[in-house]
Amino acid sequence: MSSLLNFYRKVLNVPLSLLVKSRAIPTDPVKELNLNLEQPIIYVLPYTSQTDLLILQKNCLSLNLPDPLQNNELNGQSLPRYVFLDEGRRFFKSKGAKSETESIFYRYLDLHRNNESLDVQLIPASVLWGRSPGKESEPHLRLMSSFQRIISMIWFGRDNFVRFSQALSLKYMVAEHGADEGIAQKLARVAKIHFAKQRYSAMGPRLPDRQAMFNKIIQSPAIKVAIEEEAKTKKISIEKARQEAEKIVNEIAADVSHESLRIADRVLSWLWNKLYQGINVQNGDRVRKLALEGHEIVYVPCHRSHMDYLLLSYLLYHQGLVPPHIAAGINLNFFPAGPIFRSWGAFFIRRTFKGNRLYSTIFREYLAELFYRGYSVEYFIEGGRSRTGRLLEPKTGMMSMTLQALQRGLTRPISIVPVYIGYEHVLEVDTYAKELRGAEKEKENAGLVLRVIKKLKNLGQCYVNFAEPIQVNNYLNQHFPEWKESQAEDSRPKWLNEAVDSVAHQVMININKAAAINAKNLIGSVLLASRQRALAREQLIEQVDSYLQLFKNVSYSDDAIVPNDNAEEMLNHVLTLPRSGVISEKDSFGEMIRLDRESAVLMTYYRNNIQHLFVLPSLVASIILHHESVSKDLIIKTVNRIYPFLKAELFLHFEENDVRNQVEAILTEFSAQRIVKYESDVLQINCVRVRALQLHAAGVREILQRYYISLSILLEHPEISRAALEKESRSIAQRLSILHGINAPEFFDKALFSTFSASLKAQGYFDSEGNCILEKAKEAEEILRSLISVEVQLTIQGAMEKVEEVENTETVVKTAEAVTEKNE
């Protein structure tokens, strides 16, 4: 290597060290890309740039990867550890693929002929300067001159990413395709195509001319018809209806600015460092793979907080992906937040537009246009933020529009990426508790934002897990093959409603499969399982350890995140969190850990984030606890009867025929932990560890009580309507929560009783005329009664009698009033 080039690199390193701060994608390539550091590595860069090469070198050294400027010494040959695919702008020439690169590829391939132990890993690596794709009217620029590179160094030095791609095994290439010069040329061509796809996945399509996009939408046939209908219905001119349509488009549409996104990146980096001790991201490689394969990506996260919007876009940006266009509630379109969010990719949607055909048509066309142009999209399928910490029933309007866009002939495949977002502290949790107690929801405004900002300090850890994607084209081909049949544009296909519900439900299941257990939600779950919300420190540690072993040995799913910390470390972490509500107290017997009274209600929010993970073990524990000695077959039979209700309520992923294996694994684990005695297919309480069994069983206690309330009412009044059943169940649940100190606000949530009554219907507890099938309901009621304390049973029966007395009194009063009115 020439001394002149070495000198040039040393000089160039000076401004680079001062001006450039780059970030690696992924952050741990050795682990995430499964690199074998025992085997040689060769880096492939898209075109000649000493600047990019030096930035790559700096990142490789910091990530414990081999230095690209050092050669690989193989079989007596010294071969470069990097290659450039293109000449770049050396001496104002751009010759295309370099013959020397193909020659180096060939020499590496040739080494594999007689060396079976050799496996050179070819890693595509590119350096991104800024992330703006430019405007549609601008020419495509690929290579930069020296002057442009200097300007980029100054302007984009802090917006610099080094992207490592999945390694290609040259041993595999030789085994499959041989090692001639043609294969070397093919490698270079494939690498070029890869870099083009990678650039598109990181920068996305070019930004549209906003007015031209508006005009295209307004001129679409569907909107022209809607404008004419609006004019006719409201008896206004076509021009006035068109102006109204333009106002609606302007109200909805995003106005993305990459300069605004760059500023947001700086601000949010500061904010996250101030707020969180760490942001844990899992499975980002799934999304990067889909983007490289050219999929239209739709992100569908659960909705815990307003922070979700900002957090997901920020993380996608740092995963080397394009921040999506985000469907945001119109309530967030207030000054100054509205214009800022719009520049970050938010497009606004009204809470309801039922009956407003012009608005619904425009919104559907705008969403279809985003898909057509290749922009990724994000929306919250729950419709609003969960106030209880559980997933809400999906609102399917946006999902319906997504499937309709595909059905209309979208050329790119659509992949829906469910996303689990979890926090150790949700900023709005106090507000949620007030709203659940009946307070009015406070309208979002600048003052509210300022009050929230005052709370911004240590909020613990944050978790984002990209769940298993749903490749919609494949899903529809498998479950709804008729979807490809042509339909008139304004007609609604017969398959659509069922397909929308099916995909939406699968999204919720996949989100729950990707749940993250953290210190706060696990410690909180254990304390809430104790009736006094308090445990001795040793007992708490023992129970948390029991849960950790259970989650690791009998995993809910491969995507669920189980912490690596031990119980002691998790408890110490929670005790340091401000406003956690977990208090340590000492007396003459030792240390006690308890929840303060006010925080008990708030902690149910965090428990509910992961309740679905332990509800099946809790049910198994409850059956053993109440029977004391019970056969395995009876446990499985009981679980099978109750499981469909749990599955519907908590979006569990086990199919009915998988439940037996899961229950057997739970029993084996309980036995291994000596929580129960397991001999000859009979389970018995182990008196030494009965407290651990009680705490496990408590996780499902309140759910079973709710089911028992509804079935008791149904048996007492078989002719009752579903609406009346839900209303009466809720009234009794409210009374039970007061008398037995049940702090969970969702205990009398009308949505849960509605879900249960729908499950009863789906499971065949009603005949075709809507009448209760008494024998089946009685069997289920007896099973539930065996799992509920006598004290709770008596309270429920007493409440039912009170309700009946009130109803009888009301009937007498109404009859008397009718007689009086008749006599008058």
Swiss-Prot record:
Pathway(s) per entry: Phospholipid metabolism; CDP-diacylglycerol biosynthesis; CDP-diacylglycerol from sn-glycerol 3-phosphate: step 1/3
Bilayer topology term: Peripheral membrane protein
Record's keyword terms, sorted: Acyltransferase, Cell inner membrane, Cell membrane, Lipid biosynthesis, Lipid metabolism, Membrane, Phospholipid biosynthesis, Phospholipid metabolism, Transferase
GO cellular component: plasma membrane
GO MF, any single term: glycerol-3-phosphate O-acyltransferase activity
EC id: 2.3.1.15
InterPro entries xrefs: GPAT/DHAPAT, GPAT/DHAPAT_C, GPAT/DHAPAT_LPLAT, GPAT_PlsB, Plipid/glycerol_acylTrfase
Localization of this protein: Cell inner membrane
SUPFAM superfamilies the UniProt entry points to: Glycerol-3-phosphate (1)-acyltransferase
Reaction catalyzed: sn-glycerol 3-phosphate + an acyl-CoA = a 1-acyl-sn-glycero-3-phosphate + CoA
Motif HXXXXD motif per record, residues: 302-307
Main enzyme class: transferase
Keyword Transferase: yes
GO BP terms in the entry: CDP-diacylglycerol biosynthetic process; fatty acid metabolic process
Any single Pfam family the record assigns to this protein: Acyltransferase
SMART domains reported in the protein's UniProt record: PlsC
Domain notes for this protein: The HXXXXD motif is essential for acyltransferase activity and may constitute the binding site for the phosphate moiety of the glycerol-3-phosphate.
Similarity annotation: Belongs to the GPAT/DAPAT family.
Protein name: Glycerol-3-phosphate acyltransferase
Source species of the chain: Actinobacillus pleuropneumoniae serotype 5b (strain L20)
Name of the gene: plsB
